[in-house]
Design a protein with these regions (language model features):
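Long, low-complexity intrinsically disordered regulatory regions enriched in P/S/T/G and acidic residues
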Residues: 1-7, 16, 61
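Phosphate-binding/switch region of NTP-binding enzymes
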Residues: 221-225, 229-316
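A short amphipathic alpha-helix within small helical-bundle interaction modules
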Residues: 5-8, 19-34, 38-41
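The Walker A/P-loop phosphate-binding site
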Residues: 18, 55, 59-162
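Conserved catalytic network of the ASCE P-loop NTPase/AAA+ motor domain
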Residues: 95-97, 127-131, 158-163, 188-193, ...
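Conserved inter-motif catalytic segment of the P-loop NTP-binding fold
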Residues: 132-215
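Amphipathic alpha-helical transducer elements in NTP-driven molecular machines
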Residues: 83-86, 90, 99, 143-146, ...
Length: 316
């Protein structure tokens, strides 16, 4: 709220009102902005913007002070993992999803990406009381299904209405709306409600549809990078926060094997560098396979099997 901002040194009622009008309603939200964004959104001079951002970070003790690797290892170990509800996938991921990391689920239509996202929206509600949270599901393709949540919830001991009440759905149809959802709506929800999971399904769809042609490629990649950068900022500032994006795939011919083709994630180097863990999903008969494409510590090409049933995503 404006009163929260006014408590920061260097921010009076006028500046607090300008920030609030721009959608920046708390010290936490202010602390993860950069000066150029404040100039664009609230008309604040970059030099002054830099000062008030640093003040917000100081008050919130958001330090960049390095720690030794042993201490860092302990911090990571203490992070609670989010279960997928599938033992084989949890084991593949080292115990479930880690907070702050971006998990990319890439695959063709019917590979199981959206099914897994729906299930994660439910499992995030099954933590113990202290960590139990809600989900923000940013839907760019109209694939979110309340009926699917109703079918999955009882398997995890939740009433369907309760599970649905704990999932916020943002249906976005333009790149601008997606950016607003991540930069403005998400921080507000994180401040005012116990959001523990953000899903973007799919992260690439709007960019491929609305930036057509090679002449728009550089602009498209810049805008895509901006949204992914905001996800990272949110993950660092509002821990524990779990981050999942889905991605489409492209067909790439292999020069060494004429007639053969590879399925590779769309989005180029931007998504490749932004994602912490890249996972490729595919359907194989009656079962589905999830395979590690890239990760800081998960074994390359390690995989797990799962099936999609009327009650969600399950072990084979």
């Amino acid at each position: 709220m404006a009163s929260d901002l006014e408590e920061l040194r260097g921010i009076g009622k006028v500046t607090a009102a300008r920030l609030q009008d721009a959608g920046i309603t708390s010290a936490y939200h202010l602390a993860i902005m950069n000066p150029e964004e404040l100039e664009e959104m609230a008309g604040i001079d970059p030099v002054r913007a830099s000062r008030i951002i640093m003040e917000a970070r100081r008050v919130l003790k958001m330090t960049t002070e390095p720690v030794n690797a042993l201490e860092y290892e302990e911090i990571i170990k203490e992070n609670p993992r989010l279960t997928t509800g599938v033992t084989a996938i949890d084991e593949l991921l080292g115990g479930g999803l880690e907070p702050g990391a971006i998990y990319e689920l890439a695959g063709e239509y019917g590979a199981g990406k959206t099914q897994l996202c729906h299930q994660l929206s439910v499992t995030v509600q099954t933590f113990d009381e202290q960590l139990r949270g809600k989900a923000l599901y940013i839907d760019t393709e109209g694939t979110f299904s309340p009926q699917r949540i109703r079918a999955i919830a009882p398997r995890f001991g939740l009433q369907p209405e309760e599970a649905l009440r704990n999932i916020y759905v943002a249906r976005v149809e333009t790149v601008v709306a997606l950016e607003e959802a991540v930069r403005e709506a998400a921080p507000r929800l994180l401040e005012n409600d116990s959001i523990r999971l953000i899903i973007i399904d799919s992260v690439i769809a709007l960019y491929r549809a609305q930036f057509k042609g090679l002449e728009w490629l550089a602009r498209r990649q810049q805008r895509l990078n901006y949204v992914l950068d905001w996800l990272k900022r949110l993950g660092r500032a509002y821990s524990p926060l779990y981050l999942v994006i889905t991605n489409q795939v492209l067909t790439e011919m292999t020069p060494t094997k004429p007639g053969a083709a590879l399925r590779i994630p769309a989005g180029g180097n931007i998504i490749a560098h932004a994602s912490t863990h890249r996972l490729l999903l595919r359907k194989a008969g009656e079962k589905h396979i999830i395979r590690v494409l890239d990760s800081p510590y998960l074994p390359y090409k390690a995989q797990a099997e799962f099936k999609v049933t009327s009650e969600g995503v399950e072990d084979v």
